[in-house]
């Protein structure tokens, strides 16, 4: 197949199962994706070399002709985490060509989602002032499994005692509408949740952020944590009721993780080796989740 057949597109559930988007969402994303894709195709070759001056016209017998085929190719890869060899069989191209197209198209999708305003803030710094509508935030750490590193020292750093396997971590912050507004940089699986939190520069503008006991001990004034059971003692009924109420609010970030990991490329063990690409695919998965969330409220 060169693109998803029209008969499948007509069935909303089938389109969603292949791309994570319903048809109306897909068409809206395609409009902007096409603009950026055509612009990049006119300036650069598939290998990333700048084209010589002159008008560029895409050949109809090219591997992926038209923006619709390119978006289908990319969304299906992200949704199903397909082996590149299998993706090549589906789209009638070699594995090496699949790799070239992915490196070419991923930044195009990222640019489109950024222009639409669905990508989260990223890095070590978050300023809640830009999100003035949210009354409170929820923060948590998500882990993704990776292959065991050949380097023994790296193995120790990447081994998560909680998950009992090698992982990488990111801290995310959600607003009260379950929209993910911040994504931290990558951390090794050994890094404790509180250690990640303390490493970040967060300006919460006097708005509360709900945390779980993994962040116990943090000195952030806006942090709201559940009561911790004292050793050899029990929590009071009031403390249990407070913990239950906080858990009902904090569950929003877990729902957000579930929505992001609808894309299997951030759910399965990561085969991608480069840190930059590992971060990039999670950022785009969050962008697509925020896009779906806004359109389906």
Where are these regions (language model features)?
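Short amphipathic alpha-helical segments enriched in hydrophobics
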Residues: 33-44, 81, 109, 260, ...
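Short, amphipathic alpha-helical "recognition" segments used to contact nucleic acids or chromatin
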Residues: 65-80
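Short, well-ordered secondary-structure "scaffold" segments embedded in the functional core
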Residues: 84-297
């Amino acid at each position: 197949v060169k693109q998803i057949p029209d008969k499948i597109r007509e069935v909303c559930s089938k389109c969603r199962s292949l791309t994570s988007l319903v048809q109306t969402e897909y068409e809206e994303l395609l409009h902007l994706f096409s603009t950026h894709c055509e612009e990049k195709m006119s300036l650069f070759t598939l290998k990333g070399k700048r084209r010589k001056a002159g008008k560029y016209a895409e050949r109809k017998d090219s591997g992926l002709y038209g923006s619709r085929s390119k978006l289908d190719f990319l969304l299906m890869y992200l949704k199903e985490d397909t082996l590149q060899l299998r993706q090549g069989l589906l789209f009638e191209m070699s594995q090496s060509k699949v790799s070239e197209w992915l490196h070419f198209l991923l930044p195009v999708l990222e640019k489109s989602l950024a222009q639409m305003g669905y990508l989260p803030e990223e890095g070590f710094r978050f300023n809640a002032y830009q999100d003035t509508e949210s009354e409170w935030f929820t923060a948590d750490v998500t882990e993704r499994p990776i292959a065991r590193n050949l380097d023994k020292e790296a193995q120790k750093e990447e081994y998560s005692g909680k998950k009992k396997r090698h992982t990488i971590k990111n801290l995310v912050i959600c607003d009260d509408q379950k929209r993910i507004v911040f994504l931290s940089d990558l951390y090794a699986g050994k890094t404790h949740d509180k250690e990640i939190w303390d490493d970040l520069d967060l300006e919460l503008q006097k708005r509360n952020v709900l945390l779980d006991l993994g962040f116990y001990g943090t000195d952030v004034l806006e942090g709201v944590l559940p009561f911790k059971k004292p050793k050899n003692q029990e929590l009071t009924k009031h403390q249990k009721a407070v913990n239950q109420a906080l858990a009902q609010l904090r569950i929003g970030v877990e729902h957000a993780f579930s929505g992001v990991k609808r894309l299997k490329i951030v759910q399965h063990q990561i085969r991608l080796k480069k840190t930059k690409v590992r971060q990039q695919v999670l950022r785009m998965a969050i962008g697509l989740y925020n896009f779906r969330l806004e359109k389906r409220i």
